[in-house]
Every structure is written in C-alpha cells, then in structure tokens.
C-alpha cells in the first residue's frame, strides 16, 4: 500500500515500497519486477476533472495506450490469462476496502449471439 502515498516528487517510490525496477522494452518508465503482470503505456491524455458546474478540481484522469504487455508464463493456460491463479487484489471502494479473487468465485456467462 506504500505506493498509494502522496510523496514528494523527488522521492523514489521503488525504494519507499521495497520494490525492484525492471527496464521496459518500449517506454522509458520502469516496470515493477515483482509484479507478474506489467503493462507498458504511452500517455494519450491527461484530463483535469471538474464539478458539475464546470469548476476544476485537483483530480486528474490519466489515459494511456498499452504498447506492450508482460505476463509471467505460469499465469497462462493455452495462451489464456488465468485470473484466479494470479490472486489479484482489487480496490473495493472506501478508504480501506479490498477484495481478493480466487477460483471459488469463478462462473461462466456465455454471451448471446449478436443479432
């Protein structure tokens, strides 16, 4: 959770969180070596959000284009990413609520044919 802290611009988040930077192939920003899945992205847009009245707030929406994906091969089965195997943790809302995904939560939902 250390990487969610607001820290001074010059402070190294990798050092603070005890994580290892890994070189990316297509972008200059490093990846997190300990993460089994990494996306390399290029900035598309930075949009300052506003109130309903159009007043700017101190919150930004950052959109990027994924230009490379790195996935630990142990998380792939027949080329398909196995979400539960990765045991991801998801933000659930509020200041401290999270969920963990495991295989017991899986269900199949077949999409209807497009008409």
Give the ranges of each region predicted by the language model.
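Basic, polyanion-binding surface patches
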Residues: 1-115
């Amino acid at each position: 959770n250390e990487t969610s802290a607001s820290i001074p611009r010059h402070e190294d988040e990798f050092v603070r969180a005890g994580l290892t930077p890994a070189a990316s192939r297509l972008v200059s920003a490093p990846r997190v070596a300990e993460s089994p899945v990494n996306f390399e992205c290029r900035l598309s847009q930075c949009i300052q959000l506003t109130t309903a009245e159009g007043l700017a707030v101190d919150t930004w929406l950052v959109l990027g284009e994924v230009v490379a994906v790195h996935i630990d091969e142990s998380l792939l089965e027949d080329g398909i990413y196995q979400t539960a195997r990765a045991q991801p943790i998801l933000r659930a809302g509020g200041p401290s609520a999270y969920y963990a995904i495991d295989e017991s939560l899986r269900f199949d939902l077949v999409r209807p044919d497009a008409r």
